[in-house]
C-alpha cells in the first residue's frame, strides 16, 4: 500500500476525521514570520551558510514563561446580611495607587441609600477587581469591624506591598541575582508586569534553574519575594545524524553542538558547532553571548568557516565561506504566558570559489536585519500556543565575476506556528513560512526553497528555489506512549523561480514517527508527492522520500 492510500485509511478510521476542516480553521491564524533553514540550493556559498541556521521545523518556544495568579476574591454568604444601614459617604483608607475620585467612579459614585452587609461586601469586591484588572494582583479591599458614624463607612485597601526581597540557593550567585531585582523595593506596591518581567529575565539566563515564591510578609498586606537559583550543567551538547542534506554537498551529515557557560560574567554563554557531510564538506561556528544590563538585553557575536568540494555536475567546484555576525536582542514584553522580543542583526559573509584549481569568484554578502519574535500561550484547557518571527532585512551582494547576481534587495520574511489541542492526546500543528523580496535572482544565502526535510518533505533539498514564495504545513499529532508520537502531515508551497519568473507549486503528504527521552530522540518520516511535478535537482526522482534524524544529548 502506498503512502497516499495509507494516509487515507488512517484518516477514515481515526476518530479525528476532522483533519481537513481543522486545516482550514488553522489557516485563519496566520500572519507574517521569518524563514529559517529552507534556503539550501546549488548556489554554494549561501547553502553552506544556511547549514548554521536552525531548521524551521525546529522553531521552538523559550523556557516556560512566568505566570502569577491572583488569589480569589472573598465571597460572603447572603444570609449574613443582617440589618441595613443608611450610607451617604465612604472613607477609603491606605489607597495610594488610585485616588478617592477614581475609586468612586469604579463603584458608581457616592452612595446615598441603605446597604446590607452583603451589599457593602460587593462594593469592596468591585474595588478589589479593579485593582487586579490593573495588574495589582494581590490587592484587596476589606470592610473592617466598625461602628457606622455620621452615615460613613470605612473601606481599608490592602494594595499588596513587597516585604523582604531576597535570594536563596548557591550563595555565590546571590549578589548577581539581587542586581536584577534592584528595581523592586520593600514597601512598594506589587504590580504584575514589572515583577513578571524581572522573574522572566532571570529565568532565561543560561546555565541556571530558578524558582520563585511570594509568601506572607511580617506586616499585614506585605508579601516576601524569594528567588532561588541553582547552577545546572555548565557544559553540554548534542550529536545529530541526519540525511537532510543536498546531493551536491552530501545527503548524510553529522553535526555536533556544544554549549559552555564560562561565567566570565553572570549569564554568558559560548556555542560551538561542527559539521561534516558524506561529501567533502566541513563547517564550524563559534559564538559568544552575554547580557547587557539587568533588563533582559543580550549581545551576541559569531564567526563561522566552511570548506567544500562539490560532487556531481559541479565536481570541479570547491571553495570556502567565512561569516561574521553581531546581534543585539531585547525583550519588549514579558507578561503572563506571553513574550515579545526585538532583535537587530548585522551579518557579513565572504565566499571564495575555485574552479579546477583556479579562482572562479569572490562574493561578499552584507545584511542588516530587524526582527520581532513572539510567543503566546492561552488556556491550559485548549493548550493553544502560538510563536514565531517576523523580519525585515536589507542585503547587498557584490561579486568580482561578470554576470553574477548582485545588488541590493529588501526582504520581508516570516515563520509562525500554532499548536492547538483538539483531543486529550491529539494536537494540530500548523505553520506558515513565507518570503517576499524586492527583486529576483537572490543567491541561495537569501533565497527561498521549498524542498527538504523541513519544507515539502516529498521533494529533495533545493527543489523549487527562488526569491518569493510561501510554505504551509499541517501536522496532526497523536501521542502513542509517554516517549513516542506519530502524526500525519500535509505540505503545500509555492515559489516564483528566478529563471523566467516561473511559478512552481508543490505538495506532499506523509507519516512521521518520533521517539524521545532525555538522552535520545529519533525522527522517521516518509512522504509522497501529491503534485505531479518531477524533481529538477535529483535525477533519481525518488518518490516517496524517506527522512531520518537521530539526536543524542550529552
Question: What kind of feature is each model-predicted range?
Answer:
Residues 260-264, 287-294, 329-336, 370-381, ...:
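Outer-membrane beta-barrel proteins
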Residues 38-245, 274-282, 412, 432-433:
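Periplasmic polypeptide-binding modules associated with outer-membrane biogenesis and secretion
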Residues 210, 235-237, 264-270, 294-300, ...:
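Repeated loop/turn-to-beta-strand initiation elements of outer-membrane beta-barrel proteins
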Residues 352-484, 489-498:
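C-terminal outer-membrane beta-barrel translocator/porin domains of Gram-negative envelope proteins
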Residues 258, 453, 513-522, 542-554:
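Outer-membrane beta-barrel "beta-signal"
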Residues 304-331, 335, 349-359, 527-545:
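Outer-membrane beta-barrel translocator/channel fold
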Residues 214, 235-245, 256-257, 267-278, ...:
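Transmembrane beta-strand segments that form the barrel wall of outer-membrane beta-barrel proteins
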Residues 221-223, 250-254, 280-284, 320-324, ...:
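Residues that define the transmembrane beta-barrel architecture of outer-membrane proteins
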